[in-house]
Amino acid sequence: MPDKHIHIVSFDIPWPPNYGGVIDVFYKVRTLHRLGIKVHLHCYEYPGRDPASELNEFCKEVLYYPRKTGILYALSLKPYIVSSRRSEELMKNLLKDDHPILFEGLHSCYYLDDPRLAGRIKVYRESNIEHRYYFNLFKV
């Protein structure tokens, strides 16, 4: 039986698992690992959360991308939390194979509808109703 793989695009580094969203991501990664699924974890760096070697125990690979902050990323039709997590390096890594992709939270969804990922199994998992909050913030 061939190995099973999955890409998980996380909005933050899920170590230590010490607040809501990253708790969910971390235990999902650990559970998938225990089920024999090879996890390719893609994390956006965020102030106060450093790359974590602890994640290597549960992942085939852990890749880190800088979050791009500043006014330029706020001038987008996409929410700031999404546009500031745009990374062509992430896209290059996702295009190396055809494994399914799990986008964790609205933050990580910049490439969800990218035509380069057409035909790929993609799952968007929201942990809150952030889309409502940001839509109403946009209307104001």
Put a short name on every predicted segment.
Residues H33, P115-G119:
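Short, conserved loop/helix-junction motifs that constitute active-site signature segments
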Residues L41-K92:
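A conserved catalytic-core segment of Leloir-type glycosyltransferases
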Residues P47-S53, Y110-L112, R132:
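Short, charged/polar "capping" segments at the starts of alpha-helices
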Residues T69-K78, K122-V140:
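Acceptor-binding helix/loop patch of EC 2.4 sugar-transfer enzymes
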